[in-house]
Amino acid sequence: MMYAILILFHFFVEIQPSVETNPGYTVGDVATDFSLPNVDGKQVSLADYPAAKGFIVVFTCNTCPYSVAYEDRIIALDQQFKDQGFPVIAINPNDPAARAGEEMEKMQKRAQEKEFSFPYLQDVGQKIYPQYGATRTPHVFVLNKQDGKNTVAYIGAIDNSSRNAAEVTETYVADAVNALLKGQKPDVQETKAIGCSIKTL
């Protein structure tokens, strides 16, 4: 009985919304660049996209069921907005030593299986996700490029249905990017990220 209670408690903690204090970026902050290894073996940074109007930075992973549930929607966001100047940049923040299945080889396999149209980067040393303040996978930061600086315009969830894409009624990230493309601020600038905790030792 006690074992079952512990399992249920662990499951609840794993998936509950991110409510802890965010030590990273807030809306309006300027995000610093990074250089991280991609699944294709190359290093990728935001500076590699000089023509971009901004970025959809998604902290996601291989093993979280919420991240897996969002994969097709993340692909759709990239397909919808990449040619309009807002490409998706996916970053796996998990320490593979803390969670099996998050190794670069597994990331490469997953990217190939799902035919990711965007970079899938490994946060080696887990230095980038704390800068952003990501606490869950998935956790999204929409950046708007202004005067050569990447300003945070939206933080949080992709939409309002973490489990079922058919039940989405609020498309937070898409709405934010569409507003930025019109030269406007997003009506909704921050939501709670719902997903799995980031794994670290």
Enumerate the language-model features and the residues they cover.
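Loop/turn elements at helix/coil->beta-strand transitions in domains of secreted/extracellular proteins
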Residues: 52-55, 84-88, 114-119, 137
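N-terminal "domain-start" segment that seeds a small globular fold
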Residues: 16-47
